[in-house]
């Protein structure tokens, strides 16, 4: 008797877009994107966007009907300390999830909206939330606590949560597969508009550059990254800035944009201005310092992996980063680096260097598949 195919829909619902992928028995058979939601060039609201997505899926020919979709996986940015693994959505879990929206006010409300709309539009499917923070839930206190009064953690949940976890988890698994599980100390570098680096030991993360929010860590496209905590206090007390103004500045007007007026790293590379060169060097320095600190934490490295827009797209940046780790025995093959091969380290290198495309959608699917098998 022929076994029924497993159809899983994966959704990433953002403030102005909905990205979807439909999987059939481990294969992505359909994908699409609705963007500019709420604007003149997009759908009026998220419900209409999702209705159109379901219509596209139903008319695609890859599925007999929407009821064949038994599971829907949702990317949710923040799981707080409550959700540490993929979670089946029921009334209680939905209520608990809503209680965490204050931790990620720019993301979680829209992730939750996607869940609620799917419960309404396709009630026969089971909905799972997969969390960006989940990968870091095994952190020990010395990894996630700040040097603040301990009661601030107990009262206000102030701690490092880490983000881009779905991407770092996927890249870690893929690296282990490619290197046949010989790499125990791995540093994964997700470098794009948002950038983060994670230290992996025996398949588990032990530190990551993003913190309580995705603002901490590296300089990014429009985010400032690490700054002295007294800077916002100074600007409020002495120059009349409000917390909301600083939130806007630190998240949307800093980073590459704030330093040289350019958002796109490709433009930063092209422009031969004093400020664009400064921006490049500052970003390079922040990446090198973070990788270097994780090498110390891991007491070495078996593999360094680059992914996302900058990590995959800029051979020059990879080369400039890796020059700083020649002392560790890192040697790259320049030809392989510029040809965008999977492994760009030379045969003589003591550390494997890889360039891999991330696939958060596939990771979410795999997480759900593992969950429903149990």
Predicted segments with their positions:
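A short acidic Gly-Thr/Ser loop motif
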Residues: 11-16, 189-194, 211, 309, ...
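Short glycine-rich, Thr/Ser-proximal phosphate-binding strand/loop in the N-terminal lobe
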Residues: 8-44
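Glycine-rich phosphate-binding loops at beta-strand->alpha-helix junctions
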Residues: 302-325
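Adenine-nucleotide phosphate-binding core of ATP-dependent small-molecule kinases
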Residues: 248, 252-261, 265-298
